[in-house]
Amino acid sequence: MTVNDALKAASSQIAPACEISGANPVRVAKALLMRQLGVKIEWIFLNLNRELEDADGYFALAKRFANHEPLEYITGEAGFYGLSFNVKKGVLIPRPETEILVEKSLEILSNLPARKRPPLVAEIGAGSGIISICLALNSNAKIIASDISDDALNLARQNAAKFGVEDRIEFIKCAYLDQIYGQFDLLVSNPPYIARDYELDKFVLNEPHEALFGGAAGDEILKNIILVAKNRGVKYLACEMGYDQKASLESVLELSGFEAEFYRDLAGFDRGVVARNAFSNL
């Protein structure tokens, strides 16, 4: 079987799953082949008529995708903010909309008053480390990031080392900021915010549920983060949120003394909030 024939067969095999994920079958088939052979896309174009070695191994990867395993888990990598991060099953896959949260956080850091010390940032729910790493790469901030998952923390440390910022980020296993101390200029988080009974597609359901579902309404963890920020005197708060949570979070932010500005994602949905603590002494 040639490379071209294998691509056509795999594209047909994964087509039903692609209808669920919204992915292009041909692109997924090529990505799987690149993973199987350890080659770049140029190799595929130059070798379409070449006999494919270990076709069985390739179709085994296609079967995993056909069974709704996310492509990122199969390839072991995900693109985010122009970089390629390591990912693995058991840790949330980066989403494009979270790049907006990174941009908003960098805006906050760039507008802080000049000090002798670098800005101090806390992240709740580090996951694969993408937010903290992007902030470290694009600012002089010192960052402390928490997560309750050992798998996530180990992966985050690997990614930090991959990009050479492991000395700028401290990863700690704890909930919220329970074991983290300091006066923070910014608290950033992309927490679980999906309502417990919200119906997700089969691909998303392969991701860790503790990183997806935020409670019965979905906004419970976000509300706790706001209270943590208030009690710790955090100057700025930046969080991703669900499309239908603006009203409930707005009232909690106001009662907690935060001046909030909500932002939308590229699809036009409410997706996050940036808030300033009017009572912070930082």
Residue ranges and their predicted role:
Residues A217-A275:
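Conserved Class I SAM-dependent methyltransferase catalytic core
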Residues M34-E107:
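Conserved AdoMet
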Residues A145, G214, A238:
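Conserved SAM-binding loop
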Residues I14, L109, A160, A229, ...:
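Conserved hydrophobic residues forming the short capping helix/wall of the S-adenosyl-L-methionine
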Residues I100-L200, N224:
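Conserved SAM/SAH cofactor-binding pocket of Class I
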Residues Y193-I221:
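Mobile active-site "lid"/loop adjacent to the S-adenosyl-L-methionine
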Residues E72, I194, D244:
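Active-site beta-alpha loop architecture of Rossmann-like, nucleotide-cofactor-dependent enzymes
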Residues M1-E51, G57-Y58:
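A short N-terminal interaction module
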